[in-house]
């Protein structure tokens, strides 16, 4: 039972990402695995047409970025189009240029808060522009926000509207996935991971995971929930 995670763990993940519990699942230890499964689901099934049946599939990758994101895309033969970071997100003019010059970009994968290694915190305006431009470009354009450092404000940091709220504002939830984990909160390779997405993308991810696993480790979920009752407990732990 509970293939999406125990209720309390889903509730915590939803609170962390400001998402709805109905659109939140709890995975294994790694959010990277959830991203891989999400890309695999689009490759095999797709929101409209499976990526495996399309040519010149590409993704926009902010640089400098996470090498595992790049390796993941390489596995699927997805072309990577780089866009520089500016200190407060991606270079929007370069982002627009990539959209204009390439016909089959399937999305962007980025770390919107404390991006490693530059430390960029994407401004609300930057995220909003990414969402609006990508949505106008294609109904298949995915916004994958790997929020690996969501609660890692060790010093005063810029405030940021939750990505879920911005995606909802721009009517882009069905194309948006937000992920985070406790890899750098509790135990590396021993924490929890969470994914939240709009209905269409969420159902696609669930479809893929249902074919691969029966359930994630619910005992580990309970272990964490006994330690973290809510988001405030997580934030207090991270001070």
Report the location of each language-model feature.
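Conserved core of the PLP fold type I
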Residues: 1-139, 150-170
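Hydrophobic "anchor" residues on beta-strands that sit immediately upstream
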Residues: 107, 142-143, 177
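Short, charged helix-to-loop "capping" segments that act as catalytic/coupling loops
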Residues: 134-143, 172-173, 231-233
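Walker B catalytic acidic pair
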Residues: 147
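Conserved core segment of the aminotransferase class I/II
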Residues: 167-239
């Amino acid at each position: 039972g509970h293939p999406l995670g125990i209720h309390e763990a889903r509730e915590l993940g939803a609170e962390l990402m400001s998402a709805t519990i109905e659109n939140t699942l709890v995975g294994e230890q790694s959010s990277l695995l959830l991203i891989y499964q999400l890309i695999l689901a689009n490759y095999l099934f797709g929101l409209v047409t499976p990526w495996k049946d399309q040519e010149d599939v590409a993704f926009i990758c902010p640089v400098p970025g996470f090498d595992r994101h790049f390796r993941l895309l390489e596995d699927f033969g997805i072309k990577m189009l780089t866009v520089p970071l500016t200190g407060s997100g991606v270079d929007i003019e370069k982002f627009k240029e990539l959209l204009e010059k390439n016909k089959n970009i399937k999305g962007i994968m980025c770390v919107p808060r404390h991006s490693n290694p530059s430390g960029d915190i994407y401004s609300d305006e930057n995220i909003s522009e990414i969402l609006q431009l990508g949505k106008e470009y294609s109904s298949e354009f995915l916004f994958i926000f790997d929020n690996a450092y969501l609660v890692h404000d060790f010093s005063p940091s810029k405030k940021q509207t939750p990505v879920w709220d911005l995606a909802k504002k721009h009517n882009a939830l069905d194309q948006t996935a937000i992920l985070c984990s406790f890899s750098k909160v509790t135990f590396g390779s021993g924490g929890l991971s969470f994914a939240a997405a709009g209905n269409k993308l969420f159902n696609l991810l669930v479809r893929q995971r249902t074919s691969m696993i029966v359930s994630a480790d619910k005992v580990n979920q309970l272990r964490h929930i006994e330690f973290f009752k809510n988001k405030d407990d997580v934030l207090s732990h991270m001070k």
